[in-house]
């Protein structure tokens, strides 16, 4: 080698934490975790479930679920957006596309009655992901449910039923809804 050091400067052991299965939505890469406890505080204060906590002290501290429990909440996908270092990522769609490849579109959430603003990210006119939007008047980010975050997968599925059928005396016919 012509440039740089030929031997390591870091001789201590590196901290290795095994990844945990905390549910079907959130994937963990716990070696990235910096113990900011944003996910713990979000689960307790906003989602209302105390499924995630910090265990141990000092160098041996870890964030995980109690007794290998699953983090189940309607708002559990929001910890993906809260994590500053990417220790908590989306399990159904991890690193599918780069953000600069996607077209951003502001929209209103159709799955709840609150009119929550969401951001749709499109590629080739197909929805790739849905993230919470913010209100322009207050610049406040909203929380979205897991149903909102992942509902586009079923909406644009080729197996989705598009037409209604009416079954009269063993004879099926199209039902006009207009």
Q: Language-model segments: what does each one mean?
A:
Residues 1-178:
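N-terminal export/assembly segments and adjacent metallocofactor-ligating motifs
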């Amino acid at each position: 080698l012509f440039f740089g050091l030929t031997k390591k400067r870091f001789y201590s052991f590196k901290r290795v934490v095994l990844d945990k299965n905390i549910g079907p939505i959130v994937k963990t890469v716990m070696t990235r975790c910096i113990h900011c406890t944003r996910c713990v505080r979000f689960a307790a204060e906003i989602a209302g479930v105390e499924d995630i906590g910090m265990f141990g002290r000092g160098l041996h501290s870890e964030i995980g679920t109690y007794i290998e429990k699953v983090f189940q909440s309607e708002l559990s996908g929001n910890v993906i957006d809260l994590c500053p270092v990417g220790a908590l990522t989306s399990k159904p769609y991890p690193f599918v596309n780069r953000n600069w490849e996607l077209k951003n579109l502001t929209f209103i959430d159709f799955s709840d009655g609150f009119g929550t603003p969401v951001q749709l990210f499109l590629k080739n006119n197909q929805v790739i992901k849905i993230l919470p939007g913010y209100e322009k008047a207050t610049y406040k980010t909203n929380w979205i449910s897991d149903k909102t975050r992942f509902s586009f997968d079923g909406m644009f599925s080729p197996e989705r039923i598009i037409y209604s059928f009416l079954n009269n005396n063993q004879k099926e016919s199209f039902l006009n809804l207009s």
